[in-house]
């Protein structure tokens, strides 16, 4: 067992930061059910773009992105439409940990057709590089069917 996974139980067991990071990194699920549901809708949308529409990184356009409201409705989370960024951040963390392009790059504001303000602070995401991240997402064949 790696040394940093060993800890003593002195009354109250407190996991070290390294143990928490290890567990989070190798977790197969999202931190919240909401993030998992959103991620699964984004995975469905990714498959739709690649399989049904036969899009490539060169042919995808902003009109193919999934507006936050539609994303939340499809996940039966309509009440999150205005605050969905927090959960999309968890999706970004999962993608970053799994070393795949950010699925959350496919989710956009309906009016502007670009991601919301929180996109820039999400793991592995940069608003300045957003379109390249979308293209990498569309090209990726490593995503699971479901999370």
Place the predicted regions along the sequence by residue.
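Basic, amphipathic alpha-helix used for nucleic-acid engagement in HTH/winged-helix/SANT-Myb modules
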Residues: 4-31
């Amino acid at each position: 067992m790696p040394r940093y996974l060993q800890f003593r139980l002195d009354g109250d067991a407190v996991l070290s930061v390294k143990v928490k990071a290890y567990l989070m990194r190798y977790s197969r699920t999202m931190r919240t059910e909401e993030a998992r549901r959103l991620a699964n809708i984004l995975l469905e949308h990714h498959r739709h773009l690649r399989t049904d529409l036969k899009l490539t990184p060169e042919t995808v356009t902003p009109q193919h992105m999934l507006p936050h409201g539609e994303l939340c409705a499809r996940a039966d989370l309509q009440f999150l439409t205005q605050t969905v960024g927090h959960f999309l951040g968890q999706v970004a963390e999962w993608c970053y940990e799994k070393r795949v392009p950010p699925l959350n790059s496919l989710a956009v504001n309906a009016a502007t057709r670009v991601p919301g303000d929180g996109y820039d602070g999400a793991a592995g995401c940069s608003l300045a590089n957003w379109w390249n991240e979308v293209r990498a997402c569309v090209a990726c064949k490593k995503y699971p069917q479901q999370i």
